[in-house]
Amino acid sequence: METIYALSTAAGRAGIAVLRLSGPHARAALRALTGRKAGAPREAMLCRFRDPETHAALDRGLAIFFPAPASFTGEDVVELHIHGGRAVIAAMLRALGQLPGLRAAQPGEFTRRAFENGKLDLTEVEGLADLIDAETEAQRAQALRQMEGALGQLYEAWRARLMRALAYAEAEIDFPDEEVPGDLIAKLGPDIEALETEIAAHLDDGRRGEQLRDGVEVAIVGPPNAGKSSLLNRLAGREAAIVSDEAGTTRDVLEVRLDIGGVPVTLADTAGLREAAGAIEQEGVRRALARAEAADLRIVMVAPGVSGIGNGFALARPDDLRVLNKVDLGAEVPDGVIGISALTGQGIDALEAALAARVGSAYEAREHPVITRARHREGLADCAASLARAEAALKAGRDAELVAEDLRLAARALGRITGRVDVEDLLDVIFRDFCIGK
């Protein structure tokens, strides 16, 4: 096994940089750079780092040794905390490259070794990646729960129940002469039904976890000159869109990223909806309608004296936020409509509060684990389909072999999500529960 090394902190100038080594030669590399043995595990040691060939001083910093298996990767790990100048980092990386048995790590290789050594399952690996990429508080909370194992533990608990059911089925098939009740297959029905119900409820989540991870899309739609671009600028706090009295100024979808109540939101300003005269504006209207249809939430905006496709709120859906702009001109605000002035800022606080309440209630991070990736959903769907077949086979009185095969497929589908499929753990369950071979 090779020892790998890499810069663990972001590239560029900084006060501190951290280099990480992992593998059997990590301890020897530390001695080659410092002329000293590794200190006590997990204790910082002040060192002078030298070039292993010329012995020229490179930097002065801290070294920390994490012996296997109590480390991130499960291998011997060394962290070198050095000054974050580009020249210092480059010199230290060159020095590490001179040492035998060391090579530069590939992207994600430290985390891959952590997975291969059983320190993380795949959902925890994905949670770690999401935590690094988190931009908002809700994203951070969701990613941290997943990184700490909440999602993987749920799937492993379901898989353990499946393995137990499979063990009963296999026991009846493979050990007919042992003291195993003959009606075990019939007793599996309630357990399978309970698992089906729990997995179905988990799948029926409105894709909230995926949307929170990727961001919620909010589209501003309405006729030309309703003030959509002005509202985008007001909510963004900057001049992101061109504002003009000329109708049809916005011809493509303009996006800004916002943090609303801890939830990442992509706010999209769309072309004004009207019977466009030119081909370019017609394409803008087509894109606006498509974007509005695909959005998770829409702000339907109108203003006095403007008209377009679906005058007023004719295009509004029941869950849309309805906004009347230019109330500073004295327009009456109907019930269920938020009155604003994108020009003066009047009513913007009320709109932001309504938007935060709508987004927050639907997409805030939940206490229970949620699906965060399409592959999780696909694996759960495969598991549910196999369970449905197993239940149907039970009710039809088919052979135990058919039931066992579907239970096995269901367990493997869950195991693929966490990356811990193990064909040997079936025998462990059988011996523990039935004392076969005793």
UniProtKB/Swiss-Prot annotation:
Q: A Gene Ontology CC term for this entry?
A: cytoplasm
Pfam name, any one: TrmE_N
Entry keywords, A to Z: Cytoplasm, GTP-binding, Hydrolase, Magnesium, Metal-binding, Nucleotide-binding, Potassium, tRNA processing
Answer yes or no on keyword Mitochondrion.
no
Q: Which domain of life is it from?
A: Bacteria
What EC number(s) does its UniProt record assign? 3.6.-.-
Cofactor: record remark = Binds 1 potassium ion per subunit.
Name the residues that bind Mg(2+): 229, 250
Q: Where does (6S)-5-formyl-5,6,7,8-tetrahydrofolate bind?
A: 20, 79, 119, 438
Cofactor(s) needed for function: K(+)
Subunit description: Homodimer. Heterotetramer of two MnmE and two MnmG subunits.
So what family is this one in? Belongs to the TRAFAC class TrmE-Era-EngA-EngB-Septin-like GTPase superfamily. TrmE GTPase family.
The family database entries (PANTHER family) matched by this protein are listed as:
TRNA MODIFICATION GTPASE GTPBP3, TRNA MODIFICATION GTPASE GTPBP3, MITOCHONDRIAL
What name appears for this protein in its UniProt entry? Answer: tRNA modification GTPase MnmE
From the UniProt record, report the name of the gene that encodes this protein: mnmE
